[in-house]
Amino acid sequence: GRQSIDKDDVKAVVDTLNSDLLTQGPKIAEFESLLADYCGAKYAVVLSNGTAALHLANIAIGVQRKTKVLTSPISFVATSNSVIYSGGSPVFCDIDEKTFNISPSEIKKIVAMNPDVSGIIPVHLGGLIADMESISRIANENGMWVIEDACHALGGQWTDSEGVERKVGD
């Protein structure tokens, strides 16, 4: 698809560029509040790009040297690079042939052979949400953490097996 940028968007950017507060002005706080509301989150913190966001998330969760992290090979390079930037090693997990997202059955196989894998970074490719119920269950059963790469799925939602509507990032 195409991006949706209208005249009001262009005016808002020009107004900000012409203001005295370019990088930490009131528009940042306004955008963070709107983004949090849109995603159903309590807070949102904007960064320069998705790579920086993933890198920060990896650092915050403790990725460091020798940390192994499962992720999809079908993604923008930032997903795996964020692990590398933090000192860890990405371990690529095959995808589901129907959704093109990381495959829970393949995650199970890799974790069984590599019990030292610390976490999973599923990518919601093209807005199609990965099987987060299965991925979360596998992570919980194995003492692993999950960071969702939701760059393609901001505000996305899915319904779990009990009929409960979930938001990306729950």
Protein language model regions, located:
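N-terminal "arm"/small-domain region of PLP-dependent enzymes with the aminotransferase-like
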Residues: 1-21, 26
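Generic structural signal for small/hydrophobic residues in well-ordered secondary structure
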Residues: 13, 35, 53, 69, ...
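Phosphate-binding glycine-rich loop
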Residues: 21-68, 82-85, 92-94
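Conserved coil-to-alpha-helix start sites within the AMP-binding
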Residues: 74-80
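Active-site phosphate-binding strand-loop segment of PLP-dependent enzymes
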Residues: 98-168
